[in-house]
Amino acid sequence: GVTYSSDNGLTWETGRRILSGTDPKPENPAGQGESYGLGDGCVVWNDARKVWICYYSGYCDDPGNYMITMACSEDPAGAAGTRKKWDGKAFTVEGCNGQTQLGGANIKIANLDTYAGGNPSVMWNHYIGKWVMVYHSWSRRICLSTSADGIAWEAPISLNLGEEEAMYPNLISEEGDQTGGQAVRMYYAADMNDLGQRSLAWRKVVFY
């Protein structure tokens, strides 16, 4: 969803849905692996293309798993009803119908299926002149990919952080979470167990 504040975050307007899955949420969820929702959204302003891009996790029929995909809005405010989902080649799929409140199918981002996962954190890195994405795989490994345009992504690499399991990465620099330079910090959940217990950790990521 999307909402707006005109007083620096003190109060917020009622949110509106901007992206949705193909099926309504059932009263009794069918369980893992079924497509009833989207999550893990990370929204960035792509200045070169003059669009908002939302990277998120959604169930994709191909390959039958939750994958990272994306949707964009050309509206400066990113208003409800303006987002189109990725169709594998362009942004043409309806994000959320105003009447049904359902959206079109989710299509995976090519190359990122090397490691299926979610919770993307995306930042423009002006040192290397590329977009950088980190996310966790469903096997609880943190992966990193880069893109020149924010659309076509390189095959990700799995980072060896020393922990047996790591999830929920976020890129933060001295400039914030939208842009960064040669060195940025990556915060993440380390040593997460099946009960969800974990510790906060961070690593310095240096680009060359």
Language-model region placement:
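Beta-rich carbohydrate-recognition and catalytic domains
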Residues: 1-33, 47-115, 125-165, 176-208
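Flexible gly/pro/ser-rich segments immediately N-terminal to CXXCH heme-c attachment motifs
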Residues: 31-38, 43
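Beta-propeller and closely related beta-sheet repeat lectin domains
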Residues: 39-42, 118-121, 165-176
